[in-house]
């Protein structure tokens, strides 16, 4: 009935588990639940320094979330790959896109190494970008990111157009 967006990263899997437990307790159909956890640990390492586990263990948790949600909570956005914090940490618009798409590609490659279907988990990836006050630069950034992400996903084996979409929000 209500989509919940949780800006939580290293402990995102715990909050997701609590959310699912509450949904079960209140009789909700997990196949209909919608929401998002940020769950972007690579950004945490690069831009914020707020992480719990080393990168390898963190990537395992993230790909486990991709796999579990695809089966149990298929409308859940399993990650919001964040350029916002990268930009706030001092990057340019170009660097924001470069680092964010690079992180996104790393998540996709980790999921593929786990033999997950890119056309399934790819539809649940989302992005979060910063919008500074140069309107034309920001519009160009978003358009370029959209095209680059589609190409990255296609090169990694996506065939479903929805899996190649760059779904994002900005602030």
Task: State where each predicted segment sits.
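Catalytic core of soluble alpha/beta enzymes
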Residues: 142, 152
């Amino acid at each position: 009935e209500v989509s919940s967006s949780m800006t939580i990263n290293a402990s995102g899997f715990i909050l997701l588990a609590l959310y699912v437990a509450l949904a079960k307790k209140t009789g909700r159909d997990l196949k209909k639940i919608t929401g998002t956890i940020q769950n972007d640990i690579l950004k945490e390492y690069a831009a914020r320094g707020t992480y719990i586990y080393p990168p390898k263990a963190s990537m395992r948790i993230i790909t486990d979330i991709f796999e579990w949600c695809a089966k149990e909570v298929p409308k859940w956005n399993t990650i919001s790959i964040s350029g916002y914090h990268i930009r706030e940490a001092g990057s340019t618009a170009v660097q924001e896109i470069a680092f964010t798409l690079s992180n996104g590609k790393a998540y996709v490659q980790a999921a593929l190494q786990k033999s997950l279907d890119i056309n399934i988990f790819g539809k649940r990836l989302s992005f979060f970008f910063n919008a500074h006050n140069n309107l034309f630069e920001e519009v160009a950034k978003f358009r370029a990111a959209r095209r680059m992400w589609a190409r990255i996903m296609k090169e990694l084996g996506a065939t479903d157009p929805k899996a190649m979409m760059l779904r994002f929000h900005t602030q």
